[in-house]
Amino acid sequence: MPAKAVCVLRGDVSGTVFFDQQDEKSPVVVSGEVQGLTKGKHGFHVHEFGDNTNGCTSAGAHFNPEKQDHGGPSSAVRHVGDLGNIEAIEDSGVTKVSIQDSQISLHGPNSIIGRTLVVHADPDDLGLGGHELSKTTGNAGGRIACGVIGLAKI
């Protein structure tokens, strides 16, 4: 059954991100735009809670129902919510989001509906950086924008 979701990002930067899944076994297509990022890569993750009462910090850790180490989108071992990086080509411009991911879902136990999408200040090292935070957060820095992922009309 097809499903769609949307997330409106708010914070120091802003944007709108859409999620489309044709059926429960299909990958999720993530698309949209983020405005106001500094030039370079920025960690892009689904966090465990849809709680933004204390800004982005109340969203909890990365969505990780399998209790794995942090990794990149193509890593064999990763959090479900590890979507890697989005890259701003220029300061404060529009950054296009175009990702296809088979770990997140809009159905079942790996559903991201009601969870928070977070854009981070720094690049995600995909768990390979050797920093003490590499295996938990990708050492991606502060949370500069976030929003709750909600169901959208098909």
From Swiss-Prot:
Record: residues binding Cu cation: 45, 47, 62, 120
Record note on cofactor: Binds 1 copper ion per subunit.
GO cellular component, one term: cytoplasm
Principal subcellular localization: cytoplasm
InterPro entries reported for this sequence: SOD-like_Cu/Zn_dom_sf, SOD_Cu/Zn_/chaperone, SOD_Cu/Zn_BS, SOD_Cu_Zn_dom
Location(s) in or outside the cell: Cytoplasm
Cofactor annotation: Cu cation; Zn(2+)
Protein name per the record: Superoxide dismutase [Cu-Zn]
Annotated binding of Zn(2+), by residue: 62, 70, 79, 82
Superkingdom of origin organism: Eukaryota
Assembly with partners or alone: Homodimer.
EC nos: 1.15.1.1
Organism: Bombyx mori
Keywords: Antioxidant, Copper, Cytoplasm, Disulfide bond, Metal-binding, Oxidoreductase, Zinc
Cystine crosslinks: 56-146
Family to which the UniProt record says this protein belongs: Belongs to the Cu-Zn superoxide dismutase family.
Enzyme class: oxidoreductase
Record-linked Gene3D superfamilies: Superoxide dismutase, copper/zinc binding domain (2.60.40.200)
Recorded catalytic activity of this chain's protein: 2 superoxide + 2 H(+) = H2O2 + O2
GO MF annotations, alphabetized: copper ion binding; identical protein binding; superoxide dismutase activity; zinc ion binding
Function summary: Destroys radicals which are normally produced within the cells and which are toxic to biological systems.
